[in-house]
Structures are given as structure tokens and as C-alpha cells.
Amino acid sequence: MSEMTPREIVQELDKYIIGQSEAKRAVAIALRNRWRRGQVPPPLHQEITPKNILMIGPTGVGKTEIARRLAQLANAPFIKVEATKFTEVGYVGKDVESIIRDLTETAVDMIRNERQVALRQRAEELAEERILDILIPGPRDSSVPRSDEGTRQKFRKMLREGKLDAQEIEIEVSAPKGGVEIMAPAGMEEMTNQLREMFSNMAPGKTSTRRVTVSEAQRLLTDDEAAKLVNEEEVRALALERVQSGGIVFIDEIDKVAVRSGTQQGSDVSREGVQRDLLPLVEGSNVSTRYGVVKTDHILFIASGAFHLSKPSDLIPELQGRLPIRVELEALSAADLVRILQEPENALVRQYGALLASDGLALHFTQDGVQRIAEIAQQVNERVENIGARRLHTVMERLLEEVAFVAPDGSTTALEVDAAYVDSRLKDLAQDEDLSRYIL
């Protein structure tokens, strides 16, 4: 569990997300409260439940990114789902309990990877011994002469120095369990997963023989040994604990299942049903998964939506009450788009610069060039459809399409992207509303 203070969490989020300070503060406090709850002695700490969050704001302003980065900071199991993908129990489609099942799968993979990393050194030692057994065939017991042990040490030294990396050897590694394809109707995913696991467990563990270089064998055998060293029962227990105490569920498009007042239709019945099915998860219930029963009482739920056609008050009252923290995210201005292009650690101008540097092309963006890109993105957002910062991806792709195509030819080794270059590539397109509607 992360021990970062809310201020430190906000500072970390600032590295990747521009603006939206109110939303950052809300999620930072929610994450810190998890650590605080861990310091509260029982039985009171069982009574302290997370305060779920409702983010309200247009698309492309950072709602999803805030939740995703928060999960990375917390090292917590995280899943993003769209409310529109689920249907009420009894209708064809996915039921909401699959959210928790998928979250548990994520946690199991996370714990398993952590255990394999922790056991990496031991796995590397075992892999080294297996490679030496192949390179120096013969019995390895107390009756082995000392001269053979000396030979083994010589080969071990050569192996560690990389002198044998190019040599080819035959190795045996555990073969992945054969998948059994089972066709089933929508909504029966859990049952088909259990059947698939049952059939795969019935088959004996198989190995496959491969001829590879020594360097490749070291990697494959290390992975193989690490997988054998991991205690699956321990992984399951730790995964269930981490999901229950630290899981984060991000429910996007929650506004699409809100029923607008005065517009009750046949399809709206199912929308309200999805809300009622979500309610037990959000307020706390037990969900059966293939790894055991998961209690959702202390899972943090972050719901988000644009609420263009509906209002948060159109959600059923019970669900509104389970999302007590409301945060409004502001639409992005041209100044925000300039900062998004330059300031984050994963800024777009850095990404494109690194990509084209692979072809030996040095890309340089001037300040007025960045400003012009942001202005064009803002203009298209205002005239066509406001998709926030995602518009920058579209504009940048169009701007650098030609240079990305010719860069491998070596005809250009440096390019300065200034306002004049941006206008030459995008001005006519941005001003033609019909073209920008379909291309930008």
C-alpha cells in the first residue's frame, strides 16, 4: 500500500496530466485514506469504507488517465470498464459481476509477476545448472570425480562471461497448457472459464523440446524455473487480499445508463437495471470468482461521464448516494493543449521526436509551432466535436504524415516544425469544415 501523502500523489499526477487540480486532490485523498484505514485498529477499520468518486467532464480532459496513473502509484489491481457494455441480469450480454472477476484475474497476474521477480535470482541459478547439465552430460552425484567438477566450473565461468552465448543447445521447457475452446452464450463467461480450466488440468503437464542459442536458453529456462518456484496457492490468497483491500474499478460512460427524466422508454428499463445491478457491487457484496469469494466492501469505484444529455441527478438515488464525492473537470483551453504537448513526461512532441530519431531524423518543435498546433486542435474541437486532448493525436499524425513516410529514405536528417510549417500542412484543412469533419 502506498504511503505517499496527498501532496506527493498530486505531484506525481502532475507529471502526466495537465490541470484538473480538483480531481487530482479528490483521488489523492481517496488513496491516502486507504493507507489511513490500514493504521486503524480492528474492529473499526472494517467499518471504514472508501468514498467512491463521480468525475463529471467532457471526453479527453484526463478522467481515465487520472484513474490509471493512480492505480500505478498505488500498485493496485485496476480495471477500466464501460457501463454501456453491461446488461441487466436476464438480458443477453455481460453481467456486472464480470467486472470483479476480471479485476481478480488482473490481481493474480500482478502478484504472480511480483513473485517471479522476487525469485528471479534463484531461478537464474537453477537455469544455469540446467544449461551446464546439457553442455557437460553425465551423472551429477557424490561419485563424480573432482576433475569433472573442475570442468563444470570452467564452463560456468565461460557461460557467465558470455563466451557460449552463440552456441546452440536443445532444451526442454514446460509447454503451455492446451486451450480447450468452448462456445457458450453471452453472459456465461465464468462457467466456460471453469470448464476450460477443468479440461486443461485433466491433461498431464507436457514439455516441449526446442533448439536455441545458449543466451536464449538462459531466458527461457529462467522463466520456466521462476514459474515452477511460484506457489500458486500463495498467489491466489495474496491476490484476493489485494483486490479486496486495494482494488480500483473505473466505470466510464456512466452517464449513458442514466435515464433522463421524462423520457422513459423501453430501452431505458435495461439501463436502470444496469444501475441496480451495479448497486450491490458499489455498496459491498460477495462475488464468486474462480479464485474464491471477493468482498467488494473496500474496493474503490471511480465513475465518470460527460453528462451532455443527462444529469448526475438522473442516476437512481441509491447509486448517487454511493458516489458521494463529485468532481467536475474543466474543458481544455488552447493554453492547456500547449502545455499537454510539451510538459508531461510522455509529451507528444517527445514521443514523435523519439520515433523519428530511429530513422536518423532530428525533429525540433519551435514554441510558435507548438502554439499553432494547439490553436488548430482547439479550432477543430470547437467546430466539429470537442474530444479534448485526443484531438492532438489526430492533428500530429496529419502534420507529420509526409515526413514519417520519407524519413527512412535519408533525404532529410533534420526538420524544424514552426508555425509556417504547421500552416503549410494543416491550415487549409483546418479551415475547410467539411474536410476537417472527416480528416481531423
Swiss-Prot record:
Its main location: cytoplasm. GO terms for molecular function: ATP binding; ATP hydrolysis activity; peptidase activity; proteasome-activating activity. Disulfide bonds: none annotated. It comes from the Bacteria. It holds the Pfam family AAA. One of its GO terms (biological process) is proteolysis involved in protein catabolic process. GO terms for cellular component: HslUV protease complex. Signal peptide: none annotated. Belongs to the ClpX chaperone family. HslU subfamily. A double ring-shaped homohexamer of HslV is capped on each side by a ring-shaped HslU homohexamer. The assembly of the HslU/HslV complex is dependent on binding of ATP. HAMAP family: HslU. SMART domains: AAA, ClpB_D2-small. This is ATP-dependent protease ATPase subunit HslU. Keywords: ATP-binding, Chaperone, Cytoplasm, Nucleotide-binding, Stress response. ATPase subunit of a proteasome-like degradation complex; this subunit has chaperone activity. The binding of ATP and its subsequent hydrolysis by HslU are essential for unfolding of protein substrates subsequently hydrolyzed by HslV. HslU recognizes the N-terminal part of its protein substrates and unfolds these before they are guided to HslV for hydrolysis. SUPFAM superfamilies: P-loop containing nucleoside triphosphate hydrolases. ATP binds at residues 18, 60-65, 252, 318, 390. It is found in: Cytoplasm. NCBIfam families: hslU, PRK05201.1. The lineage of its organism: Bacteria, Pseudomonadati, Pseudomonadota, Acidithiobacillia, Acidithiobacillales. It comes from Acidithiobacillus ferrooxidans (strain ATCC 23270 / DSM 14882 / CIP 104768 / NCIMB 8455).
